[in-house]
Amino acid sequence: MNKIITLFTIFITANLSAQNFQLHRDFERDHFTTTFEFFKPDKYGNTFTFIDFDYNAKSGISQGYYEIARVLKTEKMPIGLHVEYNGGLGTFEANGAQGGYTINDAWIFGLNYAKGNANWGFSTYAGYKAIKNSGKANYQVTGTWYLNLFKDKLTFNGFADLWSENGLSERTVFLAEPQLWYNLNKSFSLGGEVEISSNFAGFTGSYFRPTLAIKWNI
């Protein structure tokens, strides 16, 4: 689970905040990833943030990625205003030396629509994406969903992103991460995800990368 550009997973909760910690084993890339997610609604909308760490360096963490999003929406507004920031950094090894890199800062400004209840829900937004050092205007469209089955014993959730990186006529990126969880109880779940991507993170073409994971609902 290597979310380099974006992730936006909102669980529609009436009056409660929610946070969870996930530990994933990525079989293709042969490393662990941890994810911490936090979601909190209020009378003016909701705030979502998460941070990913990849453990692919000999000494520990090889990459960190951070995202925070705010939806401004009251009960009288059918559509919310979406503001989001993405960014991160990482390390790599080459010829016995260690180097570093940054993931270009990105801001997204758009409109959000969400609908759901205790059993199912979805959220979607579309907006203008300003990527640092990109010479052209970009866009991003995101959809997230959740579905609770068999009296909440099974949860199917995830997201799908589509965005441009250098204007409308050049590189278009797709990333989706559907997750399936078996809920042992209210605190712990076992499951995993499949990262489905096209032209993502410097790779050309399509990839399918499965993980096995455990989730702790805090």
Feature locations, PLM:
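Bacterial Sec-dependent N-terminal signal peptides
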Residues: M1-N20
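Transmembrane beta-barrel strands of outer-membrane/channel proteins
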Residues: L23-R25, T49-F53, V83-G87, T124-Y128, ...
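Residues on the lipid-exposed face of transmembrane beta-strands in outer-membrane beta-barrel proteins
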Residues: F36-K40, I68-L72, W107-K115, A126-Y128, ...
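Short glycine/proline- and aromatic-enriched beta-strand/turn motifs that initiate or cap beta-hairpins
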Residues: A18-A57
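Repeated loop/turn-to-beta-strand initiation elements of outer-membrane beta-barrel proteins
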Residues: Y44-T49, T74-L81, G116-S123, L147-F156, ...
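Residues that define the transmembrane beta-barrel architecture of outer-membrane proteins
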Residues: D30-T34, S62-Y66, Y101-W107, G135-V141, ...
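Hydrophobic/aromatic-rich structural module bridging two neighboring secondary-structure elements via a short loop
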Residues: G60-G110
